[in-house]
Amino acid sequence: MNQKLTEEKKYNEKVLLIKRVSKKIPGGNYISFSALVAVGDRQGKVGIGIGRALEVPPAIEKAISRAKKNLLTVPLYKKTISHEVKLKYKAAKILLKPAPEGTGIKAGSVVRSILELAGVENVSGKIFGSRNQIVNSYATIKALEKLKKRG
C-alpha cells in the first residue's frame, strides 16, 4: 500500500484541455466531458492521455491513468534536446530546436507544458498549421519520440 502511494506521487500532472461534448440521441443531447492530461517526472519521462466521462473529475482520472500507461523516455542532453526535430502530424507541423543554457522554454500552448513535464529546460519550439490542442500535443509527443540519444 505504501509503495503504491510513493509510486503515484512521483509524476506531475497537468490538465491541458477540458471540453464539454454532446451527442444527439433520440431523447435529446447526451452530454459528457473530455479531458487531455500530460504527466511527467521532469527527468525525461512524459506521456499524454485522453479521458471521457459524464463528470469532469472522472474524465481527468481516466486521462491520468492512460497517460501513465503511455510514458515515453526523452533523451536529454545538458537540460535540452539532443538535436533539431521537424515533424508533420496530421495538420500540425512542429519544429523543436535545442537552445543554450539559460534560454528557457520558448514554445507556446501545450508544447510548453509537455516539455516542462519532460524535464527539458532550454528549447525553442514552434507549431505551424494547427491550433487544435489535442493534435498539437500528439505532434509534440511524436517529435520527442524521434529524438536520438547523444553522448
Across the structure, where does each feature detected by a protein language model lie?
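Ribosome-associated RNA-binding proteins
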Residues: 1-151
